[in-house]
């Protein structure tokens, strides 16, 4: 979480964690691939860690995102993703490829239909 001054709030609440046990992921082509948990480099074994951020709650307040004018806007919080390089296994062949991970929590808004009766 970013540090906020008194009186400042996030529109959406997020939680960030280091993920060390990821075994599968989606690559850039949309294929599910096997992520190697342990990586052997020069006879040393390393774990792959991924820093992931996701939304705590899609609706931090009953109307959706915090601070959005619910009279004119529909809103909800959603997790977005990005691609990072990871050592993966495909058909007994290890290779570096980009995999999708959770990276942020953002607010999505859409205008409500105004009814002028």
Curated annotation (Swiss-Prot):
Tissue specificity: Expressed by the venom gland.
Intrachain S-S bonds: 12-77, 55-105, 65-107
Keyword Cell cycle attached: no
Cellular component annotations (GO), alphabetically ordered: axon; dendrite; extracellular space; synaptic vesicle
Main location: secreted
Source taxon at top rank: Eukaryota
Keywords in alphabetical order: Disulfide bond, Glycoprotein, Growth factor, Lipid-binding, Metalloenzyme inhibitor, Metalloprotease inhibitor, Protease inhibitor, Secreted, Toxin
SMART domains cross-referenced by the UniProt entry: NGF
Localization (cell): Secreted
Transmembrane segments: none
GO MF entries: growth factor activity; lipid binding; metalloendopeptidase inhibitor activity; nerve growth factor receptor binding; toxin activity
Family annotation (PANTHER family): BETA-NERVE GROWTH FACTOR, NERVE GROWTH FACTOR NGF -RELATED
Family under the similarity heading: Belongs to the NGF-beta family.
Subunit structure: Homodimer; non-covalently linked.
Protein name (Swiss-Prot/TrEMBL): Venom nerve growth factor
